[in-house]
Amino acid sequence: MIKLENLMSIDKEQLPEAAKVISSSELSTIVKLLSEKNDKIRYQAFLLLQYRSLQFNDVYPYWENFRLKLRDSNSYQRSIGIMLIAENARWDLENKMEASLDDCMELLKDEKPITVRQSIQSLGKIAEAKPNLNEKIASMLMSIDMVEIKETMRKSILLDILNVLAAISKSLKSDKIDSFIFNSLSGGILDKKAIKQIEMLLI
């Protein structure tokens, strides 16, 4: 059984390797630590599960735990939920993602801009793992009303959206996506550096 002091003694650089040697029986303890009020403990547990999910499918059985977090009153928990769902979409042979997508989409309207950003980035990972959902994901991203977003966050959020749409456009040909990207690049929210960044993705 993994001990808390052992968990917290792992350096950030060692986390990817540490995640490889976690036993399946220790995972339930680490998943429970996601609800810790202590930020450091919670974040360490999250990173271990995130790295573990990149290589093994034994975090996937906790999918419903992560889905419940999407509706948590705490924004950190909502972010943890969607990010771990995104990492485990690659293992989703039971097609749970289809049933969870609407809950994930709700976070695009989250009160916390950082949660909105993490949700958009997570949807990018989901789109990569689940190409059949690309059209729905793209549609929801394009429906985000930038006017309702805090002005200081508009550029960052629009860049996140365009990064995902640029990736989706590689496999999903859509006039709507092309038009949205074009209008966004000429809409005045992005600076020259950001525009160049997106243009490079479209090559």
Regions found by a protein language model. Name each.
Residues 1-52, 165-170, 178-203:
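N-terminal alpha-helical scaffold/docking segments in eukaryotic complex subunits
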Residues 11, 42, 78, 116, ...:
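Residue-level detector of extended alpha-helical repeat arrays and alpha-solenoid scaffolds
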Residues 21-34, 57-68, 94-107, 131-146, ...:
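Amphipathic alpha-helical scaffolding segments comprising HEAT/armadillo-like alpha-solenoid repeats
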Residues 37-39, 73-75, 111-113, 149-150, ...:
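Short inter-helical turns and helix N-cap capping residues of alpha-solenoid HEAT/ARM repeat scaffolds
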Residues 40-52, 65, 79-87:
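Non-membrane alpha-helical segments in proteins
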Residues 50-51, 86, 124-125, 159-166:
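Structural signature of alpha-helical solenoid repeat scaffolds
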Residues 54-55, 90-91, 128-129, 171:
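Alpha-solenoid helical repeat scaffolds
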Residues 72-121:
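Hydrophobic, well-structured mid-protein blocks that either form specific transmembrane helices
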